[in-house]
Regions:
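Short amphipathic alpha-helical segments
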Residues: 22, 89-92, 112-116, 161-162
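ATP-dependent small-molecule kinase phosphotransfer cores
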Residues: 31, 35-95, 120, 128, ...
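NTP-dependent small-molecule kinase module
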Residues: 1-4, 23, 27, 73, ...
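Hydrophobic anchor at the beta1->P-loop junction of P-loop NTPases
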Residues: 9
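P-loop (Walker A) phosphate-binding loop of NTP-binding proteins
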Residues: 12
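Short glycine-rich anion-binding loops that position phosphate/pyrophosphate groups of nucleotides
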Residues: 82-85, 106-108, 154
Length: 170
């Protein structure tokens, strides 16, 4: 493996960043960092509780601080939260020091995965057309990642292999 860069997984909530990240880190022998799980551990609260008690701004500020801190390290697989890559500072740090992969799914697949999930504070009270709009808006930013992986017709293991092959060739 030539690269010492991090692998950073970006994409919508429900895209599989955490599950793909865990599999990928085992496959290539790098540490795995799930930013949302790390935030929950530090705060001793779920993401939903943080949003409810402290608000989205507090969460986003904390997410930026923790994400940028982790992105400065090397040789990790990092799963960013669904909204983290929208933050210009996180995106800039990611693109400067990491190889980023957008786990892209069709809106219909993502909607099926997230619409009834109580752990997703941003979509808890949204209608399907509002979720679709959120997906479309975020896609305009996710596209700036280094690589786009179209996941709909791939198994988790095929996604992992694709990322591994690209990373090892970079």
């Amino acid at each position: 493996m030539k690269s010492k860069k991090n692998i950073v997984l970006v994409g919508m909530m429900g895209a599989g960043k955490s599950s793909i990240g865990k599999l990928l880190s085992k496959k290539i022998g790098l540490d795995f960092v799930d930013i949302d799980k790390l935030i929950e551990k530090i705060e001793d609260k779920t993401i939903v509780e943080i949003f409810r008690i402290s608000g989205e701004k507090y969460f986003r500020d904390l997410e930026e601080k923790i994400s940028i801190g982790k992105l400065k390290n090397t040789n990790q697989v990092i799963a960013l939260g669904g909204g983290a890559y929208l933050n210009r500072n996180i995106r800039k740090q990611t693109l400067a020091q990491s190889t980023s992969f957008w786990l892209n799914w069709s809106p219909s697949t993502l909607i099926k995965r997230i619409k009834d999930n109580k752990k997703r504070p941003l979509v808890l009270n949204l209608k399907i057309n509002e979720i679709k709009k959120l997906i479309d808006e975020r896609a305009k930013i996710y596209i700036s990642s280094d690589y786009k992986i179209n996941c709909d017709k791939l198994s988790k293991f095929e996604i992992v292999k694709k990322i591994k092959d690209i990373y090892e060739d970079s």
